[in-house]
């Protein structure tokens, strides 16, 4: 009887507990990192980016940079004139704080035109919640 009550309590707690979503760190370009000759549109296909996730740009410092830009700046490969808007460390983490389209380019001359740019769509909320745990066949309410 105590086991049945424990199972019922566990099932109720499992059903009532909010889903826990953990942030995901996405290394842009995976092992290739952030550089020339990588198709970032292909890299982003099939990935779901959620608010709270992180983009990690890994590259040789001084060889590349990362700028978060507008859609027009992305399409035209326009680097913002304010260099304080860029990241240059070679290991830059950008938290995805809001939902919507996000655009990133390399600010080194010719790199964006050469394909070093990334467009993603960030979704609101976390990953889907796991299915609730059903009580065992011998439990009663």
Language-model segments: which ranges?
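Short, surface-exposed secondary-structure boundary micro-motifs
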Residues: 54, 59-60
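Short, Lys/Arg- and Gly-enriched loop/turn segments at beta-strand edges
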Residues: 62-71
